[in-house]
Amino acid sequence: MSPRPPAVSPLPPQPADAVSSDVPPMTDPTHDSLSAEAAAWPDLSDRLGRPRGGDGARVLAVTSGKGGVGKTQVGANLAAALARGGQRVLVLDADLGLANLDVVLNLSARITLHQVFTGEADVREALVDAPGGFHALLAGSGLVEYSRLTPEVRDRLQRLLQQLRPYLDVIVLDTGAGLSDVVLYTVSLADEVLVVTTPEPTALADAYATIKVLDRHQRPRPLHLLVNQVQRAGEGAALAAQLQQVLDRYVGPRPPRLRLLGEVPSDTAVRDCVLRRQLLLEQAPGSPAALALALAASRLMAAA
């Protein structure tokens, strides 16, 4: 058996080969030509502006191993900061059966992704304008049909992104927490991944497990880390360095390289905005947490 990580580490003492065999191997999404079908897709220019040209939007999956780390708040506020910088941004609630982006943003939608996927509506009807200057696609809640990855869900997610990419600069996928097959497939569709964690040992352990599984089952991509709810300056950087050391030692032969996108301090303004269902960058733009998220967004753009 491989040696355990140092006892002082809050990260999980397990070797790289301890990944559960229950996790399905993930393959890269196919990018086959859909030109005939694309010609029949609705023109989204009236909602999203004229197509941008080039390769289309960057797709960023915001994910976490553990729930309750502030992943959706982080994704929404990053989107607002990017929109302030002139980017066309859309946040897609990819937690298809247990959505909460609508709760965080105090939004309601007559049409959700469920209606789009079932053909009851097209994507134009589901697009909503979010506070902060970005667009959102909201999902449903309590929908058991999205608890497992089916061929239909795979196909609908992939084609939806192909439809949206030409019109946007950045698409943020707000995934569910954990390592379900739906979460892993959603992450596989992204160009880059942001793992959100907190200094809590269980959150760090789950972040480590998430990174390990992505490294083992998916293609290499830029991998960002954001440490939320830190208690002191520099805590996030120290935890990121510690996490990288554990990856270097136990995940091989070529361990993933983490890029620390930022650390967000514990801030009462965040709790106030959560309770009021308000966007932090809109309601408390000068708060320490909002400033940290704005800095993280600028680093994300610099990494493009």
Outline where the language-model segments fall.
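Extreme N-terminal, non-catalytic leader segments
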Residues: M1-G68
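Walker A/P-loop phosphate-binding motif and the immediately C-terminal alpha-helix
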Residues: L48, G56-D95
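P-loop/Walker-type NTP enzyme "switch/lid" segment
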Residues: V91-P166, A269-L279
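Conserved nucleotide-binding/hydrolysis micro-motifs of P-loop NTPases
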Residues: L96-L98, S141-V144, G178, E200-T202, ...
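Short, hinge-like loop/turn segments at secondary-structure boundaries
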Residues: N106-I111, V213-L214, A240-Q244, L280-L281
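Conserved catalytic-core segment of NTP-binding enzymes
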Residues: P166, V170, T175-G262
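Beta-strand-loop-alpha "switch" segments that mediate conformational coupling across diverse proteins
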Residues: V251-L281, L293
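NTP-binding/hydrolysis catalytic cores, primarily Walker-type P-loop NTPases
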Residues: L275-A304
